[in-house]
Amino acid sequence: MVKIYGNWCGPNWTGGRRLSAQEYDERGLDWNSKAISPLDAGCRLHDFEGRSGKMPRAADTRLINTARSRVLSFRAQVRMEAAALNPFISRKRRRDLNARIDESIAAERVATGISIARAFRTS
């Protein structure tokens, strides 16, 4: 079990639990459980598609594309980090900025991890 991000992103991290997607499905748990961001929702779909124990290559491709779309450019991330340090912004705005930065960092990890895993999958 490695939680990478949110409720759904990470090997054997499914629905906020230390379970494989197959175990999660066999226990009849809710696949509509909350995703905290678009990246987390992409991970949930990926888990759902791999619930049989075999991960379709198309599911990997979809998650890689979703993850890459959530990665901030260097400039955008620096701007968000600077904005989050502004003492005059609201707590909610600071929390939202930090959450988006965290999602971007996790998205890089997810895209890289799935790309590597896909190279070793037999299905």
Residue ranges and their predicted role:
Residues 1-123:
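Extended terminal accessory/targeting regions
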